Amino acid sequence: MSMSSFRLNDHHRSHAHHKRVREPLWLYALAGLCASLVGLGLARFAYTPLIPALIADKWFAPSDAVYLGAANLAGYLGGALIARRLAARIGAIASLRVMMLLASLCCLACATPLSFAWFFGWRVLAGLTGGVIMVLAASTILPHTPADKKGLIGGVIFAGVGLGIAASGTLVPLLLRQGLTETWLALGALSALLTLLSWRAWPVEARSTEALANHQPAQHTSSALVTMLCAEYGLNAVALVPHMVFLVDYVARGLGQGIAAGSAYWVLYGLGAIVGPLLTGHLADRAGFGPALRTAFLIQAVAVALPAFSAAPAVLIVSSVVVGAFTPGIVPLVLGRIHELIPHSSTDQRAAWAQATTSFALFQALGAYGLSWGFAHSGGHYGMLFAIGAAAAAGALAIELVAALRGRRV
C-alpha cells in the first residue's frame, strides 16, 4: 500500500474521530441545557407569573404567596451547599438525574394545594434541585470541553435558564387559561419529558481517583482571586434583584401602565435571557473570560441604572433585554473564569464553583429581602432599587479590576 493511501486512511480516521468528539460534546451541552431548564427555568422562574393566579383563585393569601417565593430561594441556597456532598455520595450524573426527577415531581405535587405546609415543602425542594443542578451540571460537562469552546458550551448549558424565563412570560399565561392545576401538571409533564430525553446524554463520569492523583494544592494567590470572584458574583446577584423582582410591578403600578404592559417587558427580559449566555460565552472564547467579565459588569451597571433616570419605553426596552441577557449570561463567564484560575484540578474547580453559587444564592436572598424592606420603608421609591442594583454591579466591576491588577503582578 502506498504512502498516499496511508495518509488518506489516517485523514479519514482523524475526521471520524473529530466527528465523534464533536457529537457527544453537543449532546452533553443539550443535557446540561435540559437540566438548567428543568431545575432553574421551569421549577423556579415559572412560579413568578403564577402568583397572581394563586391569589385570584384563593389557593393562598398574598402574603403566603410571597413566602412561597422565598421558600424557593432558601431551597436554592441549601442545594448549593449540599451539591458536592451529594455528588461525592452517589456521583454527579446520578445526582443530576435525581434532581431533574425531583423537580418534575415538585411541579406535579403543586397541582393540588392540600395545605400551605405541603406547598411550602415542595417549593423548598424545587429550589434545592436548582441549587444542585447549578453547581453540578456545567462542572460535569466542561472538563470534557476543549478550552476554546468552554464559553460557548457553557452558554448553551445556561441558555436553559433563559428559556425558562421566556416560558414564564409566554407559555405559562397560555396554560393558565386551562386552570392552575392543569398548568402545574403541564409543567411537571414537560420537566419529566426533558429529563427522559437527556437521561443517556450525559458524559461518562470519571472516577475521583484521577482527580486525586492530579490534585495539587492551590496557590495562595489563586485562592484569593477565587474569593474575590465569589464576592463579585454575589454582588452581581444583588444587581439582578431590581429587574427580577420589581420590573413588572414597576411598569404595572409604578408607571400605571397595567399588568399587561408589565408582562410584555418581562417577555423582553426573557428573550434577552435566551441569547445572553450564548453571546457572553462566544465573547469569552474570543476575548478571554476575564475581559469578558469586566465588560459584562460595566454594561450591566449601566443597564440596571437606566430605569432610575428615564421611564421612556425605548429605555425600558433596552434595560429589560440587556439585564435579561446577563441574568444567565454572567454564569458561564464566572464558571469559565474559575477554570482559568484553577486550570488543572476538576475537584478544586467544582469546589470553587459551589462556593461561588452559594455566594450568589446568599446575596440574592439577602438582596431580595433587603430591597423589599427598603422599598416598603421608602414609600415605594422604585428609582432607589435600580440605583442600588447599579451600585452593586459597579462594586463587582471594581473588585474584578483589582483582581486583574493583582493577577498581572504574580
Stretch-by-stretch model annotation:
Residues 78-114:
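Conserved MFS/SLC helix-loop-helix module at the cytosolic interface between two early adjacent transmembrane helices
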Residues 132-145, 329-343:
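Intracellular juxtamembrane helix-capping segments at the cytosolic ends
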Residues 116, 147-149, 155-203:
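Helix-loop-helix hairpin linking two adjacent transmembrane segments in secondary transporters
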Residues 117-126, 314-322:
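Paired small-residue
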Residues 346-379:
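A late C-terminal transmembrane helix in Major Facilitator Superfamily
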Residues 48, 226-267, 277:
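Extracytoplasmic gate region of multi-pass secondary transporters
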Residues 122-160:
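Cytoplasmic helix-loop-helix junction between adjacent transmembrane helices
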Residues 59, 91, 112-117, 256, ...:
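Helix-breaking motifs and short loop linkers at transmembrane-helix boundaries and internal kinks
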